[in-house]
Amino acid sequence: MKKDIHPDYHAVVFQDAGTGFQFLTKSTASSDRTVSWEDGNEYPLIVVDVTSESHPFWTGAQRVMDTAGRVEKFERRFGGMARRKKKA
């Protein structure tokens, strides 16, 4: 490998902002904030909005959108507007 062209790939702790869940992984991301991990070492801390701990797909709290009902509701509210034409 060539020197000085690759990003610094190091251990980082990611924390879910909503749940507080933390996990240690490797990344090129860096941060000024640090956290002491279970092994006693200090690692950079990256706070993220969504992780597998809080995302609806992974938590099972996923909702299915009723698109047919939404289209019918739209048609009821605005369907007649397209049919009406003003005569000049």
From Swiss-Prot:
Q: Which UniProt keywords apply?
A: Ribonucleoprotein, Ribosomal protein
GO CC annotations on file: ribonucleoprotein complex; ribosome
- InterPro entries, alphabetically? Ribosomal_bL28/bL31-like_sf, Ribosomal_bL31, Ribosomal_bL31_B, Ribosomal_bL31_sf
GO: which molecular function terms?
structural constituent of ribosome
- Biological process (GO), any one: translation
Q: Which family does it belong to?
A: Belongs to the bacterial ribosomal protein bL31 family. Type B subfamily.
Under the heading HAMAP family, the entry gives:
Ribosomal_bL31_2
Q: How does it assemble?
A: Part of the 50S ribosomal subunit.
Name the chain's protein: Large ribosomal subunit protein bL31B
Q: Which organism is it from?
A: Corynebacterium glutamicum (strain ATCC 13032 / DSM 20300 / JCM 1318 / BCRC 11384 / CCUG 27702 / LMG 3730 / NBRC 12168 / NCIMB 10025 / NRRL B-2784 / 534)
